[in-house]
A protein has these predicted regions:
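A beta-strand/beta-hairpin structural motif
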Residues: 64-88
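Short acidic/polar inter-strand loop motif in beta-rich domains
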Residues: 103-115
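A short beta-turn/strand-edge loop motif at beta-sheet boundaries
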Residues: 34-41, 55-56, 90-93
């Protein structure tokens, strides 16, 4: 029983330490694979959102947005784009964070989507053991 109590205490301490406020800075690479068709003049848009994981019916808040204009890629060659998303915001306790990544045209239509390590799902970052550096791989939204 004493061992169980110590384990719970350590788990609570670790969770509290992980949620201490820090810098909400996310860095990484957006990879456009060889198979993606030629693109030119598009915009790469990355957004960092903050949400309360305990409130299901509340929308996430936009913390930072980065737009890289005139993105270009040639089919048959992998293209890498480095990014840094926000340096001035702080991580808030008991909040979670995720990023979105899209390639959009001049009218705002989304063509490509970035996924963490090429895996579908929410790209969580910064808290709960999630990284502050990510590798996003673009894919066609229609596939």
């Amino acid at each position: 029983m004493k061992t169980l109590l110590i384990a719970f205490s350590l788990a609570a301490f670790t969770a509290a330490a992980a949620d201490k406020p820090g810098t909400a800075k996310v860095t990484g690479t957006v990879v456009t694979p060889k198979a993606v068709n030629n693109i030119s003049g598009f915009t790469l848009e990355l957004r960092l959102y903050e949400y309360d994981p305990f409130l299901a019916d509340v929308s996430a808040d936009l913390v930072a947005k980065l737009r890289v204009k005139n993105l270009a890629h040639k089919k048959g060659k992998e293209t890498k784009t480095e990014f840094t998303l926000t340096e001035s915001s702080n991580i808030k306790p008991r909040r979670s964070y995720y990023i979105t990544c899209f390639v959009i045209d001049a009218k705002g239509k989304r063509h490509l989507m970035g996924e963490k390590d090429g895996k579908r799902g929410l790209c969580k970052v910064l808290t709960g053991g999630n990284p502050n550096k990510v590798n996003l791989i673009l894919r066609d939204l229609r596939k």
